[in-house]
């Protein structure tokens, strides 16, 4: 479990029946908590909803129950001053938002959808963020993505496509990516303008100038000084713009990262004919994921790295049925 000492203290306060309900929730939440590098009690309301959606529950009753259990845990954390805030954001979630968490809804994009989206995006800034997240570049507060420079991309092109990434908390990490990813990132580093609304802006301002520097992800040029590394909000804004253009409400950095994991699972499924823990361990190694415990990470990955999900998202590629994207 993420932040296991705190969670075990909470479980010690519960009845045996409640522990049996909470422990699986904590176990399944570990991947999402690790990606955001924070405990559930510090999640935003949107992150809480994303977590609930990842459970893929099929009845509104089960969704409500999960929210109620999460709310109790957050209340406890606030009462012991563990949370950074004083408001339980789980209690601000509406019934309408809960219905949107019901299972059998699309949570991830496939590789073919990624390519189709890239073809329709006019800004390399957008293409780069989408592709880099899909191939596993993220880090604490997206620091690997935000610190990525043109030189790092060029070095990777000369070193078997292996990027040297820098996380603000965990330091250096190596990750092998595709040639397509590097080409897109290089183009983004050379981009000087950003077309608003993916080139469909109707106002007087249709494009903005970007700061000219060596970073792949850039901020808008303003009269204020600050031409260095962009903030994490630039990533949020880029993903929001992509979501709005394609009318995709589930797109977040986390779901894009998981989409990349699922694509790798599909590739391994074609090779092995099965999705088991060896496949999940392979994905952890291929993406060089930072996890405290591989065993626990593999357990958490079972929710989305399984044959049902692979068959659901890659049915056409596997010849199971015809699908329309």
Swiss-Prot record:
Transmembrane segments: none
Pfam name, any one: MrpR_C_cat
GO molecular function: DNA binding
InterPro entries recorded: DNA_brk_join_enz, MrpR_C_cat, MrpR_N_CB
Protein name, UniProt field: SPbeta prophage-derived uncharacterized protein YopR
Organism: Bacillus subtilis (strain 168)
Lineage: Bacteria, Bacillati, Bacillota, Bacilli, Bacillales
